[in-house]
Each structure stands twice: as structure tokens, then as C-alpha cells.
Swiss-Prot record:
Keyword field contains Ribonucleoprotein: no
Pfam entry (one): HEAT_2
Residues that hold Fe cation 1 according to the record: H51, E52, H84, E85
GO terms of biological process kind: peptidyl-lysine modification to peptidyl-hypusine
Annotated EC: 1.14.99.29
This protein's name: Deoxyhypusine hydroxylase-B
Cofactor(s) this protein requires: Fe(2+)
Family: Belongs to the deoxyhypusine hydroxylase family.
Organism: Oryza sativa subsp. japonica (Rice)
Length: 302
């Protein structure tokens, strides 16, 4: 199984959705082969696939991947969306030894979204160190390793909204407010999150779209559609909007994904293609990930 999945992930002749199927399957595995394949994919010519591979390594919290992720972060020839995801992955893994490189990239990386991610990752590592074991080990209700711990429980939605939308507030505090609002998930919280699609930071806007995808709330469809349609928006934000629309999956969202699967920006068109493929598997009652019997005959598949 491992060999088949690694080969499928790295086979550039495969449709992008097939490669994503392999990627999503590999992130549930551990060991040298899955790690090597994901790290190789993090330098793929598809920036969408490359950034998703780096994201997966962060979600897996695989400390063995740190040196290669640091090399990705330092490589300015790679797309900012890939460097950003490498920085976020280092923050998710959460080891103090990554702080010095994150500080270096914060100072020298030319892309604002990468700088902001480094700032977040440094703060996340520090917060993890200073937080009680019980609090830092709290699992997200959405089973994701988030770039910031949620703001402390008990803050009213209106206060969290103000924090999230405050352009003078630190990026970490705004992210913390975002995840607290996500965990609340009520109508007022969703309204606050949708409002944040208009903030100045492309990094924060992309995380807002990601969170709306986690929530799968149809109240966000119109705002996400506007983001996807905006060709002047940062590709990483449009990409997350496309994925979020795929998770909401109403008829209008599906029609829009079909339209923008032809977008000239590959990060956007491939996101739509993957989202539509996932929906197709869901409709047919099949898992998007590859599922094998206990003893798969993977050598026979290609």
C-alpha cells in the first residue's frame, strides 16, 4: 500500500485529484516512506500539491520532517504559498529549535504572507511552551492542528469579533479569536468570521475561508463565492474559498467550482478540480482516500 500511494502521489502524469487522493491517504500513515514522499511532493511543480504536502506534514506533527521543511522555508525559488505552509508546519510540530530559523525568515522573506506565518509559528511554539499540558493538548473539535490556540473560553462573541477585525491587533490574537469563534459556531460567530473576509491580511483572509470550510455553513456561500470570483484576490485565498465551497456543496457552489476549474491560475483551477472530485466520490458513497484490504496487492495497481 505504501509504495503504491507514494508512487501515485509523485506521478506527475496522474490527474491532480488522483495525486490528492494519495496525499490524503499518506497523511494517515507514519514512517520514512510516507515522510519522504510528502517531502518530495513539497517541491512539486504543482504549487497546490506542494503546499498541501507541507500542510500534511505539519498536521502529522512529524519532527523528523523538520530539516527538510526548514529547507523549503528558506528556498526563495519556491512559491510563497509553499514557503508559508512550511513555516506553518514548523509551528504545528512545535519544537523550540525551529524558532531561530523562523525568526530569520521573518526578517528576510520578501513575501508578507510568509513573514506573518513565521510570526504566528514563533508565537504558537512559545504559547505551547507556556501553556499547561492539559490546555495545550486540547484537541480541536475539528481534529486539526491549528496555527494558534483558541482565545480563552468565556469571551463573548462580540469581543472576539472586535479582536478578529482589529487591524492594530497582533496576528496571533486575531487567529486565536478566529478559532474561538469557529469553536462557538453559532450564527453570530459565523457572521463575525464572514466579516473577516474583508480584512487587509491575505494570510488571515485565507485562514478565514479555511475555517468557513470547516464549519460548512451555507450562510457563508455568497461571501465565499465573491472571493472565488475575484481574480484580483490572492490565489491562496481563492483556493481556500474554492475548497470551502466544495465542503458546503450546494448547487450554486458546485456550478461555480465547475466554472472556475478553468481559471488561468493553477492554484485556483486545481483546487476546484480536487473539490469537484471529492464531491463525486462522496455522492457515490465512496471514500476519497484510497482504501485497501488488510493485505493489499498494490503492485498490481498502477
Amino acid at each position: 500500500m505504501e509504495g503504491f500511494l507514494c508512487d501515485r502521489l509523485l506521478d506527475a502524469a496522474q490527474p491532480i485529484a488522483e495525486r490528492f487522493r494519495a496525499l490524503f491517504s499518506l497523511r494517515n500513515l507514519r514512517g520514512d516512506a510516507p515522510r519522504r514522499a510528502l517531502l518530495q511532493a513539497a517541491r512539486d511543480s504543482s504549487n497546490l500539491l506542494a503546499h498541501e504536502a507541507a500542510f500534511a506534514l505539519g498536521q502529522m506533527q512529524d519532527a523528523e520532517a523538520i530539516p527538510a521543511l526548514e529547507a523549503v522555508l528558506k528556498d526563495l525559488s519556491l512559491h510563497p504559498i509553499v514557503r508559508h505552509e512550511a513555516a506553518e508546519a514548523l509551528g504545528a510540530i512545535g519544537l523550540e529549535k525551529s524558532i531561530s530559523l523562523l525568526e530569520e525568515s521573518l526578517a528576510v522573506d520578501p513575501a508578507v504572507e510568509v513573514q506573518e506565518t513565521c510570526e504566528l509559528a514563533i508565537r504558537r511554539i512559545e504559547e505551547q511552551k507556556n501553556t499547561s499540558g492539559v490546555e495545550s493538548a486540547t484537541v480541536s473539535p475539528f481534529l486539526s492542528v491549528d496555527p494558534a490556540l483558541p482565545a480563552k473560553q468565556g469571551l463573548p462573541v462580540e469581543q472576539l469579533r472586535e479582536l478578529l477585525l482589529n487591524e492594530q491587533e497582533s496576528m496571533y490574537e486575531r487567529y486565536a479569536a478566529l478559532f474561538a469563534l469557529r469553536n462557538d459556531s453559532g450564527d453570530a460567530a459565523v457572521s463575525a468570521i464572514v466579516a473577516a473576509l474583508g480584512v487587509k491580511s491575505a494570510l488571515l483572509r485565507h485562514e478565514v475561508a479555511y475555517v468557513l470550510g470547516q464549519l460548512q455553513n451555507k450562510a457563508a456561500s455568497d461571501a465565499l463565492s465573491t472571493v472565488l470570483k475575484n481574480v484580483d484576490e490572492h490565489p491562496m485565498v481563492r483556493h481556500e474559498a474554492a475548497e470551502a465551497l466544495g465542503s458546503i456543496a450546494d448547487q450554486e457552489s458546485i456550478a461555480l467550482l465547475e466554472e472556475f476549474a478553468k481559471d488561468p491560475e493553477p492554484i485556483v483551477s486545481q483546487s476546484c478540480e480536487v473539490a469537484l472530485s471529492m464531491l463525486e466520490y462522496e455522492r457515490s458513497g465512496k471514500a476519497f482516500e484510497f482504501l485497501f484490504p488488510q493485505t493489499p496487492q498494490v503492485q498490481q495497481e498502477s
